[in-house]
Amino acid sequence: MACSRFEYVKSFEQDDSILPNVWIVIRIDGKKFHKFSKTHDFEKPNDENALNVMNAAATAVMQEFRDIVLAYGQSDEYSFVFRKETAAFKRRSAKLLTYVTSLFSSSYVMQWSKWMNLPLAYAPCFDGRVVLYPSEQNLKDYLSWRQADVHVNNLYNTAFWKLVLEKGLTNQQAEAKLRGTFSADKNELLFQEFGINYNNLPAMYRKGTILLRKRVILGEKSRQAVVPLHEDLISSQFWKEHTEILGKYVPGTYDAPQTFPRLVEMQINGKDDNEAEEPQNLAGTS
């Protein structure tokens, strides 16, 4: 940039560099998503395709930022965990936050037609925040908090919408029936009145979606992809099985189901090997 007498205005900019050696988490949340989901007729209590739009948008963010070691999503929110040593955008908070939020929002729009049958009536909006965690335990507790939130909300919403859609209760009547109940009460209600064992519902609804970068075996070859998991990250077993998250970041091998999830298939079929393996470097970006 050429020097001029107006350059002094740069002195008003704030230094928002993030402290070194801390875990950086960026969480994005949908803005007025109740209205958005109603306008686009999302299935209640969970719309699998709508959740997969979120997962696909988050995958696009992880493909852009190689320093994101884990992403976790539920409902209309997603959390992105950057490794402690990241130098992306010189660790400038505003740059990281705005890039992730805008990239997620635009990717959501681009992914919409690949998953949803209805046309997009208007663009969604997401806000975001940056939170720093100094220790591994702090980070684990944060992610455990978000997954516990999934369980509480999904159990309530499943019971609520069963009462409304199948029993014909009004929203107010369903709220009154569930008021003051505990998890055991809601589980009992679902089983006794609807024949539903809550633990048999799809894991994505009960546990949210964890995105990790893994090496996918394809015959005699392999390639990296962002894969969706629906596991219990509150347990210590999760961290033992995915040691690359907190350790030296070398993606482990994907323990693939019999059929690849569509999200993985889209990555495998949509890019050539060179593009998939190309590292990303935002360290020097201002």
UniProtKB/Swiss-Prot annotation:
GO molecular function annotation: GTP binding; magnesium ion binding; tRNA guanylyltransferase activity
Keywords assigned: GTP-binding, Magnesium, Metal-binding, Nucleotide-binding, Nucleotidyltransferase, Transferase, tRNA processing
Similarity comment: family membership: Belongs to the tRNA(His) guanylyltransferase family.
Positions of Mg(2+) 1 binding: D29, G30, D76
Gene Ontology, cellular component aspect: mitochondrion
Cofactor(s) listed in the protein's UniProt record: Mg(2+)
Function: Adds a GMP to the 5'-end of tRNA(His) after transcription and RNase P cleavage.
GO BP term (any one): tRNA processing
Catalyzed reactions per annotation: a 5'-end ribonucleotide-tRNA(His) + GTP + ATP + H2O = a 5'-end phospho-guanosine-ribonucleotide-tRNA(His) + AMP + 2 diphosphate + H(+)
Statement: the UniProt record of this protein carries the keyword Transmembrane helix: no
Cofactor note: Binds 2 magnesium ions per subunit.
Positions with a binding annotation for GTP: D29, G30, K31, K32, F33, H34, S75, D76
Enzyme Commission numbers on file: 2.7.7.79
This protein's name: Probable tRNA(His) guanylyltransferase
Entry binding sites for Mg(2+) 2: D29, D76
Pfam families named among the record's database cross-references: Thg1, Thg1C
Species, as recorded: Drosophila melanogaster
